[in-house]
Amino acid sequence: MSIQTDDFAAPPPKRILSGAPASPNEEAVERALRPKLLDEYVGQAKVREQLEIFISAARMRDEALDHVLLFGPPGLGKTTLSHIIAHELGVNLRQTSGPVLEKPKDLAALLTNLEKNDVLFIDEIHRLSPVVEEILYPALEDYKIDIMIGEGPAARSIKLDLQPFTLIGATTRAGMLTNPLRDRFGIVARLEFYSPEELASIVRRSAGLLKVPTDEKGGFEIARRSRGTPRIANRLLRRVRDYADVKGAGEITLDIAHRALVMLDVDPQGFDLMDRKLLEAVIHRFDGGPVGLDNIAASIGEERETIEDVIEPYLIQQGYLQRTPRGRIATLAAYKHLGVTPPAAQSGGDMFGAMRPE
């Protein structure tokens, strides 16, 4: 079994509480901490149970697993699951991303080199170009592709047979997938944010692999501030380890974890400066909302896509922000978190002020 990886095109953000990998070095550390079997995978119980059945059935029949679509916020384990699926099937994994596949020939080169029942993992699959997506359809349905040979009047199309394979597509934006592409996935799984208890198990496992002494309370303190995201939990664990080595005795205790996370500006709810800036902007500059995403982005100096994909989902999931047809609204929990008295409208009157368009 082999794993091959193409470099991803999009530069990742460097925010410590981002669910995206911060650097190639971090990706290497993540690979070392990544579970290799479903039995080692923590969380996503329903998805794990489904995959155990589907993978076992595919192995019993000696056929390719149905194509899999994994979607959800960044850092929840989509890439990890793709590696686990390939490992459980005992096949090779070829990994790439949507932006890398610029031309049909780029995808054709990958597909024609796959062996029987191999797994092709495409991250950011919603960013595939339409021309590349077109040649993917017959590959997914019939294991065939049409490619053009030559140019101009002499050009001709030839049909190539492919080995049966499994495509695993991952995306943070399932709504941006075209209907024809979405309909070709036989297995669709949404990954949810993790509970603090699940993240505490991940922190314990990672601390063991990193050989970092960590007591139960110290590990849980990291877990509960990790925004429900394993990648963030592992990142914070490494930063707290640094603090423990320099400012402590090398062991992560509750006190060490608390002091390190305060230094990193991560509060008990798992919010950082950017989260608080967003909530403060909605409350102080836009009277609590509703306010459009473009106005928020301009106000806090952040990209609209980063707010939508990285910052906003956790705030909404935790009940600090509401997304409405007229814009974003700060909830009573947001006012309380910032120590601000909510206006009378929030307490019982009309919550929705003048509309600010998206």
Curated annotation (Swiss-Prot):
It catalyses: ATP + H2O = ADP + phosphate + H(+). It holds the Pfam family AAA_lid_4. The keyword Cytoplasm applies. ATP binds at residues 33-34, 75, 78-80, 141-143, 184, 194, 231. It is found in: Cytoplasm. Residues 268-358 are annotated as: Head domain (RuvB-H). Mg(2+) binds at residue 79. Residues 1-24 are annotated as: Disordered. Coiled coil: none annotated. Residues 195-265 are annotated as: Small ATPAse domain (RuvB-S). GO terms for molecular function: ATP binding; ATP hydrolysis activity; four-way junction DNA binding; four-way junction helicase activity. Keywords: ATP-binding, Cytoplasm, DNA damage, DNA recombination, DNA repair, DNA-binding, Hydrolase, Nucleotide-binding. CDD domains: AAA (cd00009). One of its GO terms (cellular component) is cytoplasm. Residues 5-194 are annotated as: Large ATPase domain (RuvB-L). InterPro entries: AAA+_ATPase (IPR003593), AAA_lid_4 (IPR041445), DNA_helicase_Holl-junc_RuvB (IPR004605), P-loop_NTPase (IPR027417), RuvB-like_N (IPR008824), RuvB_C (IPR008823), WH-like_DNA-bd_sf (IPR036388), WH_DNA-bd_sf (IPR036390). The RuvA-RuvB-RuvC complex processes Holliday junction (HJ) DNA during genetic recombination and DNA repair, while the RuvA-RuvB complex plays an important role in the rescue of blocked DNA replication forks via replication fork reversal (RFR). RuvA specifically binds to HJ cruciform DNA, conferring on it an open structure. The RuvB hexamer acts as an ATP-dependent pump, pulling dsDNA into and through the RuvAB complex. RuvB forms 2 homohexamers on either side of HJ DNA bound by 1 or 2 RuvA tetramers; 4 subunits per hexamer contact DNA at a time. Has 3 domains, the large (RuvB-L) and small ATPase (RuvB-S) domains and the C-terminal head (RuvB-H) domain. The head domain binds DNA, while the ATPase domains jointly bind ATP, ADP or are empty depending on the state of the subunit in the translocation cycle. During a single DNA translocation step the structure of each domain remains the same, but their relative positions change. Homohexamer. Forms an RuvA(8)-RuvB(12)-Holliday junction (HJ) complex. HJ DNA is sandwiched between 2 RuvA tetramers; dsDNA enters through RuvA and exits via RuvB. An RuvB hexamer assembles on each DNA strand where it exits the tetramer. Each RuvB hexamer is contacted by two RuvA subunits (via domain III) on 2 adjacent RuvB subunits; this complex drives branch migration. In the full resolvosome a probable DNA-RuvA(4)-RuvB(12)-RuvC(2) complex forms which resolves the HJ. Belongs to the RuvB family. This is Holliday junction branch migration complex subunit RuvB. The lineage of its organism: Bacteria, Pseudomonadati, Pseudomonadota, Betaproteobacteria, Burkholderiales. The gene is ruvB.
